[in-house]
Amino acid sequence: MSRKQAAKSRPGSGSRKAEAERKRDERAARRALAKERRNRPESGGGGGCEEEFVSFANQLQALGLKLREVPGDGNCLFRALGDQLEGHSRNHLKHRQETVDYMIKQREDFEPFVEDDIPFEKHVASLAKPGTFAGNDAIVAFARNHQLNVVIHQLNAPLWQIRGTEKSSVRELHIAYRYGEHYDSVRRINDNSEAPAHLQTDFQMLHQDESNKREKIKTKGMDSEDDLRDEVEDAVQKVCNATGCSDFNLIVQNLEAENYNIESAIIAVLRMNQGKRNNAEENLEPSGRVLKQCGPLWEEGGSGARIFGNQGLNEGRTENNKAQASPSEENKANKNQLAKVTNKQRREQQWMEKKKRQEERHRHKALESRGSHRDNNRSEAEANTQVTLVKTFAALNI
């Protein structure tokens, strides 16, 4: 038996060989990553890539995520997808070959997207070689082969979701596309493990927010018009109840003149009514004025006094005094009525404001309790499935 055969027959030799290959692959990955960092082009005279990396990291941090870098050795796409799928990138060659095999089986789906001057056989043969850069066709093939969705993060751009199946609630793999040529894996901000990533984009929240915004924009105009009409009708009714005036146009004119101040409108309407009553009283000619116009007839010693006695004279004077006193007494009564109306209106307005504040507090409490209940349900669902929801501001589906 030769030495090689003896070495192969020893127990544990296979595991040691696999361990050695794994370490060799890791060293090659570290060297490729260092070389890729040194050879990255610096746009704008230097520091451009570092600035892009910092901006990208801040963008992901706002979503509770971070970059897990993989070497830029031409295998970065399959390394990033493998890290998401398995928790490490050591099986990138296997993922590459499986993707190429799927593209060959589904040739009619992928051949139209190959460049015209390159035959399909040559394209897939080149893609099967380690270190060959893979593009969108490989991502689509990988997603369909594994029946999952791939979400691509880019700097200052919406998320791209490549759907590998039409099923809902399927697994998602999140990768980052940087520098126009490199892919990295995306992880939770505190995830340093070698476990598979479980990230799920909250597209439902995004669509719900968009529909809510459209509904608010649609109903805002109608609600504002209805509210304004209700407020005007309510103000007119209050002025009508306080003054007894049934002239709708007159009340509206006074409300507009007083800038819809209900108390000022009530005072204005009462003054106008008082002026109308004064004019009517002047046109009726009070009895005192008639007595005065009769002149000597009712004076002492006149014909009326001799015929009816001084009683008629006293009655005429009394009636005249009543007529003279009535305007001042009526003014006092109107002032008292105005004070009562104003106080009543003020109390009613205070009661309405208090009721409105109570309704506002009740609505806030209901919204808070509903939001806390929804957050509790979501936290329970995350704890059961161990999936991290990724918020997003915009998304594009492929």
Curated annotation (Swiss-Prot):
The UBA-like domain has no influence on ubiquitin hydrolysis. Specificity is given by the S1' ubiquitin-binding site within the OTU domain composed of the Cys-, His- and Variable-loops. Changing G288D: Found in a family with an early age of onset of diabetes; uncertain significance; reduced the stability and catalytic activity. SUPFAM superfamilies: Cysteine proteinases. The keyword Protease applies. The modification N6-acetyllysine is found at K66, K105, K122, K129, K220, K292, K322. Its main location: cytoplasm. Keywords: Acetylation, Cytoplasm, Hydrolase, Nucleus, Phosphoprotein, Protease, Thiol protease, Ubl conjugation pathway. Its EC number is 3.4.19.12. InterPro entries: OTU_dom, Papain-like_cys_pep_sf, Peptidase_C85-like. Residues 65-189 form the OTU domain. Residues 16-41, 345-381 have a biased composition (Basic and acidic residues). Residues 230-270 form the UBA-like domain. This is OTU domain-containing protein 3. It is an enzyme of class 3 (hydrolase). One of its GO terms (cellular component) is cytoplasm. GO terms for biological process: cellular response to nutrient levels; negative regulation of phosphatidylinositol 3-kinase/protein kinase B signal transduction; protein deubiquitination; protein K11-linked deubiquitination; protein K27-linked deubiquitination; protein K48-linked deubiquitination; protein K6-linked deubiquitination; protein stabilization. It comes from the Eukaryota. It comes from Homo sapiens. One of its GO terms (molecular function) is cysteine-type deubiquitinase activity. Residues 1-50, 305-383 are annotated as: Disordered.
